[in-house]
């Protein structure tokens, strides 16, 4: 996604991607408010290779409002790190212990802008 222009980002989607064998890192990608647009059918992250013990990293996605990985049911190995996503809401409503096979996620949840006055 490094070479994609902001105006084209809305057209990018990987609907056939159901499983990732390694890790998924999302870092400073603009143009997305939800990952459902990008990975609508992602169900499993295996974590056979990890990034510093993490299988899912969502970091500094400044426009992301919700994770939206509605079909994600299992992270087989590795932890979750979600940090510095200023607009993200509802991260703490996901049962991460069930999805991560009892691993402990690292969640730094900022204030949800939707609820600020």
Predicted region positions:
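Extracellular/luminal ectodomains of secreted and membrane glycoproteins with large N-terminal domains
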Residues: 1-117
């Amino acid at each position: 996604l490094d070479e994609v222009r902001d105006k084209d980002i809305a057209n990018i989607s990987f609907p056939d991607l159901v499983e990732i064998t390694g890790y998924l890192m999302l870092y400073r990608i603009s143009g997305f408010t939800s990952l459902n647009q990008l990975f609508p059918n992602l169900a499993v992250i295996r974590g056979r290779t990890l990034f510093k013990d993490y299988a899912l990293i969502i970091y500094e996605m400044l426009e992301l409002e919700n994770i939206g990985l509605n079909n994600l049911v299992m992270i087989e190995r590795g932890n979750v790190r979600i940090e510095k996503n200023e607009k993200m809401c509802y991260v703490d409503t996901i049962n991460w212990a069930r999805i991560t096979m009892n691993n402990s996620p690292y969640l730094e949840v900022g204030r949800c802008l939707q609820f600020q006055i």
